[in-house]
Amino acid sequence: MSQSICSTGLRWLWLVVVVLIIDLGSKYLILQNFALGDTVPLFPSLNLHYARNYGAAFSFLADSGGWQRWFFAGIAIGISVILVVMMYRSKATQKLNNIAYALIIGGALGNLFDRLWHGFVVDMIDFYVGDWHFATFNLADTAICVGAALIVLEGFLPSKAKKQ
């Protein structure tokens, strides 16, 4: 039986486009205005800092010889396809899950674009306290983490709230 795309979770794919535009736009601005390693303080404990990540989160496998570029690209494609299928199978009214899936897809595709186009992921957000700096990250990473947090949150909600 065929169903209208608007009645499925695919109705939320617009959010993927929004995440991609914001993520790729921010990376473009960094690439056009920063040299590698440049830092600009924004607020206490927050800098813009241009870094290249050849690995995954926390530069995992960054110095592994190049194969990891294709490995992480494959993971991003696989997860995106799985989440699109899950969105298709869910109802548009299941907002929390569909928003979470769209955020994760948008973030995964933003970093996938970087890997395929540049050979690395552009990172620029440097959060720090005193001399301690968290791993530099980007808006795609933020979207993925917020999406994952929403999925966890959804698991704690009562059944009635999950259906909406």
Curated annotation (Swiss-Prot):
One of its GO terms (molecular function) is aspartic-type endopeptidase activity. Its EC number is 3.4.23.36. It comes from the Bacteria. It catalyses: Release of signal peptides from bacterial membrane prolipoproteins. Hydrolyzes -Xaa-Yaa-Zaa-|-(S,diacylglyceryl)Cys-, in which Xaa is hydrophobic (preferably Leu), and Yaa (Ala or Ser) and Zaa (Gly or Ala) have small, neutral side chains. The chain crosses the membrane at residues 12-32, 70-90, 102-122, 137-157. Its main location: membrane. Pathway: Protein modification; lipoprotein biosynthesis (signal peptide cleavage). GO terms for biological process: proteolysis. The active site is at D123, D141. This is Lipoprotein signal peptidase. It comes from Escherichia fergusonii (strain ATCC 35469 / DSM 13698 / CCUG 18766 / IAM 14443 / JCM 21226 / LMG 7866 / NBRC 102419 / NCTC 12128 / CDC 0568-73).
